[in-house]
Amino acid sequence: GWYSVKDESYYQDKELIKTGDVYTTKDGSQVDWIEEDSFFFKLSEWQEKLLNFYEENPDFVMPKSRMNEVKSFVKGGLKDLSISRTSFNWGIKVPESDHIMYVWIDALTNYLTSIGYPNITDEKMEYWENCIHIIGKDILKFHAIYWPAMLMAINHALPKTIFAHGWWTNEGKKISKSSGNTIDPNQMIDKFGL
């Protein structure tokens, strides 16, 4: 599928812009067509359940404009999600295979493993039941589509709310380590004090 190394993400055709022979995301990240053996999560089977959940829980994603983005994406059709890679050997290994977990699957499951899944105590479950994810808009589909479908697949409670904010910018561009335009907080403290 279409993969952006910069974003560490796969994209569907409907998410891309074609200029000549080059495909990019709406945010300008170049994507390349990659083929490799992979395990898949049957995301396509969760489309209707996700849409029903969004209708029954209208405040699941905030602000409403972000919820509208999520619903529109899901209504457009979901494809099964690649959850492993074979083109490199670092990362969390998939048991009894030569596959490595796709980085976003690893990252999302950390929310549960950090509180002891599958043996979550009642005390820690109380935190989960009141969980609010505060995320950047660029990782909304991972948190509001892929993650809820995965949780539904294991019959686990979903986070209470996902709040997706815009980006912090520096000279009009998204601040990110990969772009090299981050602001050093220590320099700001030296300049302005605490």
What is each of the regions a protein language model found here?
Residues 1, 11-19:
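Short, flexible, mixed-charge glycine/proline-rich loop motifs
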